Amino acid sequence: TTAGAAAMVNNFPAQDAFIVEKLKAKGALILGKVNMSEWAYYFCQGCPVGYSALGGQTLNPYGRRIFETGGSSSGSGVAVAANYAVAAIGSETSGSILSPSGKNSVVGLKPTIGALSRSGIVPISSSLDTAGPMTKNVIDNAILMSALIGEDKRDRYSYQASPIRFDHLDTVSLKGKRLGLNSKFQKDSLMQRAVTAMKSKGADVISFDPPEIQMYP
């Protein structure tokens, strides 16, 4: 409701966001709100990742002031990684769920646009914004995602997504699956162990060097 900005400190919405209503209806306990990169990092260029005027600097629990938190859903990733909560909600326009999930070793999912309602979320792009679940493992992520889906008439992109299937989560095979691996991550010992494990299950892991992306001036 504030996007971490002092300008929004007195922004008190009249009703819960649709996804919060869904969680409460299913018995979830809402522990609170967490910090984020101010204005989802879009209107605060040059600000440290994970910093906001209202919340200060979010720190990575695996190495405070050593490792970045990722952003903009910095607090969501940190809260799950530090076991403050079993699950958290992030939002993403471009990388804001996936980045803090990777930096804090949690599971993050950016759903298809419209699968989750965006009502109540400070908007950046109507065609790119979405909320998404952030958890410690895939099963918890699927459970949270299942609780969040539903059509919201307040969001014109919203639709009734198909139910999440749980019956095959423990039987999915990696045999024959082709997975891309950014070559710059290959030196990391944990990544090497993960790659070895995936290959042992039949995955074809293909190393690649991604091209540099020319940023806007």
Protein language model regions, located:
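Short acidic, glycine/serine/threonine-rich loops at helix termini
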Residues: 1-2, 41-46, 98-103, 120-121, ...
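Short connector loops at secondary-structure junctions
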Residues: 203-217
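Short Gly/Pro-enriched turn/cap motifs at secondary-structure boundaries
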Residues: 10-12, 66-70, 98, 122-124, ...
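Glycine/threonine-rich beta-strand-loop-alpha-helix active-site module
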Residues: 93-119
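A short helix-breaking turn/cap at a secondary-structure junction
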Residues: 110-194
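Conserved active-site and cofactor/substrate-binding residues in soluble primary-metabolism enzymes
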Residues: 14, 18, 74, 91, ...
